[in-house]
């Protein structure tokens, strides 16, 4: 399996998880107020964690697929807005051909807002930058929602795994 195929499958699965978590949050008694929740005072709120989770996918697809994507950096203002952005990212992932990504040893160069610049091979970018960034923000979403009292657990986080279920267990 190519690094591109692995990354796209991961994004497809885990964007599904993000959508599931956001849907459950939208049904919670605290409502839209949850969007302002944060784990610690110096951490970003839920709405930003959701936006950054989606942005990690979009940025990776743009850097590796050269699709010329313009990021929506506006704040998420509602769960409906969050779900629409997740849906758009899922559609983009589904439409991406892994063969359009560069060779695994192609150089990817990028700068981050604090002024640091990086250069690494495409597979290293995917493995060492894009994937950890994606999971960091996704786990922050999950953790904030747990902290706020949502009844979620591992089955909610790994719901996509049910497509591999076989019965009865051996």
Please place each PLM-identified region on the residue numbering.
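Conserved alpha-helical segments that form or flank metal/cofactor-binding pockets of metalloenzymes
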Residues: 42-70, 89-96
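C-terminal or internal capping secondary-structure element at the end of a domain, subdomain, or sheet
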Residues: 123, 127-168
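Structural signal for well-ordered, non-membrane alpha-helices
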Residues: 15, 19-26, 58-61, 87-94, ...
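A solvent-exposed interaction/effector surface
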Residues: 74, 102-103, 108-111, 155, ...
């Amino acid at each position: 399996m190519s690094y591109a195929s692995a990354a796209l499958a991961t994004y497809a699965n885990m964007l599904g998880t993000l959508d599931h978590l956001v849907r459950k949050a939208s049904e919670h008694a605290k409502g839209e107020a949850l969007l302002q929740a944060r784990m610690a005072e110096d951490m970003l709120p839920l709405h930003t964690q959701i936006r950054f989770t989606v942005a990690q996918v979009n940025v990776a697809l743009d850097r590796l697929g050269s699709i010329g994507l313009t990021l929506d950096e506006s704040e998420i203002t509602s769960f409906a807005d969050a779900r629409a952005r997740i849906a758009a990212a899922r559609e983009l992932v589904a439409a991406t051909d892994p063969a359009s990504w560069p060779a695994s040893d192609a150089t990817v160069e990028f700068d981050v807002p604090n002024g640091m610049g990086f250069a690494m091979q495409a597979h290293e970018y995917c493995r060492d930058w894009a994937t950890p960034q994606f999971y960091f923000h996704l786990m922050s979403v999950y953790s904030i929602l747990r902290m706020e009292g949502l009844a979620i657990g591992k089955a909610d986080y790994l719901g996509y795994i049910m497509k591999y279920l076989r019965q009865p267990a051996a």
